[in-house]
Structures are given as C-alpha cells and as structure tokens.
Amino acid sequence: MKKIIYMQIFVTVTTLVGLSAIKKSTDTVDQMTYDWSRTFAEVLQLTNQKHYKPAVIDEAMMNAMDAFLNTLDQHSNFLKPKVYQRMMESTTGEFCGIGIVIDNTRKEKDQHLTIIDTVPGGPAEKEGIEPMDKIVEIDSKALGGISTDEITTWLKGPRGTTVTVKVMRKDKPDLLTFTLTRDVIKEQNSLSFYLKDQNIYYLALSTFSQNAVNQVEALLKQATKNKYRGVILDLRNNSGGLLNAVVDIAGMFVTKGSVIVTTKDKEGRVTNRYPTTRNPILADMPIFILINNYTASAAEILAGVLKIHAQRGSTKNLHAFLIGTKTFGKGSVQEVIPVSNNCAIKLTTSLYFLPDDTTIQGIGIEPDFVVERTMPLSEQMRWFTQNYGREETFKNHIKVHITPESTPKKPLTEGADQAAKRWSERAKELLQQDNQLRAAITLINLLGTARQCCPAQVTTREKTVQFMREHLITNDTPLTIEQVP
C-alpha cells in the first residue's frame, strides 16, 4: 500500500514541477527537476514511515505546492478546495461576509490585511471598523504567510455565523478586537454623480465587471446629450477585474479596432491581442482619470491605454489626463486552472503590454499631475484644533456677548446612524473633502478657459499638459524661491 502511495505522490509531484520547468524540448523532463521531485517523494515516504506524529498527507501536499508556486511570483498560489469553491461563489457579486473592501495588492508575506473601505450598513461598519484599519488576526490565526485568497475564505461563511478579528489602527497603541456576524453582502461596483454647478460628470469604478460597462455607457450617453465640460473617471483603489470589461470601456473612448492590450508569454511571443469592437461615445470633451497606489492591474491598463491614445492623437478628440499618484504596477496575467481533488492553481502565465509595447509590471503608470491625497483630520486632531491654538481656548479670554439668532435645534440623533446610509450618500460626504477631485475640477475649468482665451496653448496634449502644469501648483511643481534683498 505504501508503494502505491509513493508512486502516486511521485507521479503527481513530477507532473507539477515538470510543467513549471523551462524546457526547449517537450519530449523529456529536466533531469534536475526529476531528481528533486524524486527526493521530495522520498521525504514524504520517510516522514510517513518514521515521524513520531501521523502525517496529514493532504494538508502537507497542499502547503508544499502552495510554497512552490509562491517561489515563482507573489501572485501564483495553490487553491485548496474551500478556497477554490469560495472564489467561484464570489463571482456572483453576492456573498456572506463582513462587508469590507480589501487591499488586493497585499503580498503573502505581509502580516496584515489592509481594509480600503467598509460597506455601508455591513457588519464591519456597524461594529466600528474603519477604512485603513489593518487586520492582523482572524479567529486567533495570524495572517503572515497566508495568501489573500485564503484569508478571504476565513472572512466569508454562512449567514449568521461569527468571526473575530484583531485590528491595528493608526494612533491606537493596542489592538482592537471585533466579533462580527456574517451577512449577505451586495458589492457596489460603481457610483456616478453629476456636479451641477461645474457641469461635470463623475464616475467611480471599484472593479471592472459587466455591470461597470453598462454604467459607463449609460453615463456617457447621458453626458453627450448635454453640453458638459468634462468627465472625471475615478479609478482609485480599483484593483482590477474582467479584462473584457476594460476593453469594452476603452472602446467608448478610442477608435473602433484599436488594440487596447496584448499579452506575451515568457518567450516574448504575443499570445493574445485585444482590440475594441465598438464605436466610441465620448465627444470632444476632456476626461480626467484619478489614480493612486491602489490602482492596479486592469485599472492600470485602462488609464495607460487612454493616456497613450491621447498622446498619439490616434483617436480624434480624445483628451485624457491622469491625476493623483503613481499606480501599483501589476501587469501580469493569472489563470485559474482546475486540478484534481477539487483544487486549482492560480498561475502567472503572461504579461500585459500596452499599445506602445511597454509593460506596467513593476513600473506602474505615472500621472500627468501629481496630487497627493490629503486625508480629513483624525478624531484626535479635530479635538486638538478645537481645544488649542485659538483665543477662545484661553481660560480668561475676553468674551463678546452676541445674541444669536433663534434657530431650531436639530435632534441629537440626526445623521448619527452611519450604518443606514447608502453607498452614494457616504460617497458624497467623502467627495466634499477630496482634494484630488477638486484638483480635477480645477483642471477642467482651466482647460475650458484656455480653449476660449488662448486656444493656441492647448492644440496638442503635450502643450495642454504643459499649460496646465504652469497654472496649477501640485506636489511636483518646483518653486523658485529667492531672498528679498
């Protein structure tokens, strides 16, 4: 019986490792790979025979295969049956979890999982978890060395069950513990608004799905009916999604048949080209794209493609500009390939290349206008500014008695129930304090003014960027400072 187990292990490991080896000939297996796979099988057999504790072969094999795939790159990993099943379930857009948006750019070696946002009305928000909190433990299990895919399965589960997380929060010396009851979470992939006073349309995409395609198309068709001044496309914190959705959305801006992205294998051979198949919708109006360090993968492709086509002038009347900070730099393609025992592997098989034959892998996309995000004051800083640094904070300050106008007092509970707010209501509040959004609005207004008063300054994209940089002070604008004699 042990010989049969040994041979099964040997054949499985040899096949897995053999598929990963770089070989010019497909008829033979690299001798070194063969030798080491044989050694691996021997170790398993000896462990099973001689170790004091009974070996759990299935768990050991899955961990070993995951460790092997992790040595290739941080995005390749082994999907255990439960992880693979939950991954397939989550594609429906509805699942039972705690209601958080996570940092998908996390590395497996990281000891924490950053929460980018919470779902309004979800379990996490109800219990007081905040954006940018960092989860360090889930049900007493540390996160270091665990893939993000597996961590998400720990957070998901049947409705009504509980999960306990320990959270590290900025300015808090101790870890915070939350016990959350899982509930149905309906993900919100997009939000759109109309800025009436500025006559600007705003659209935020958190991921790329077919629903996102429909939302972008509906907004652009509505915008083209009006004499709008510009569109702001918010790709901040967008970690990617469906590539065909990106191609469809790009097709709304660029000439039909334009190649959006190509993929190349490890030999540099082009494996796929993805051209647009539709006619563009956007009229002769600027589009400003907000990006940050959490803009990754498919979101980077869309930002990069629109920038390149605008620079080339290959699409008439495409005026695309990037605002914010450098993107994440994930330009690799992963395939989820089912294997036996209800498992799968997520394997990096190729790299994305933009229309100018450059890759974003490890490089990212640079914005045209660097604008760092300034966050609203923390609770501690709000208290500090209210209690210090003003005349009224002195104990014996002179008071001027002014009879205030009589105004009805608002109920104390008004606006306190944050959990009841919808996505759009909370987004409106956040956008009011968003300096990057305000920079985009300023640039749209600046471009509109330039087209009227000095159109010669904005005839090309290069000239337009130069003109706007001269008139907008951003984080990367050098200041010439001279001493007054």
Segment roles from a protein language model:
Residues 38-93, 158, 171, 440:
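Interdomain regulatory linker/hinge segments that flank or connect interaction modules
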Residues 114, 136, 150-191, 348:
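PDZ-domain C-terminal substructure recognizer with occasional recognition of PDZ-binding tails
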Residues 93-137, 141-144, 210, 350:
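PDZ/PDZ-like domain segments forming the peptide/carboxylate-binding groove
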Residues 16-30:
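Bacterial Sec-dependent signal peptides at the C-terminal "C-region" and cleavage site
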Residues 92-96, 106-111, 129-130, 157-161, ...:
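Short flexible coil/turn linkers enriched for glycine and charged/polar residues
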Residues 25-28, 41-50, 199, 416-425:
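Acidic/histidine-rich, surface-exposed loop or edge segments in extracytoplasmic proteins
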Residues 3-8, 20, 34, 191-485:
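C-terminal "post-core" interaction segments
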Residues 131-166, 245, 330-333:
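PDZ domains, with a preference for the canonical peptide-binding region formed by the helix
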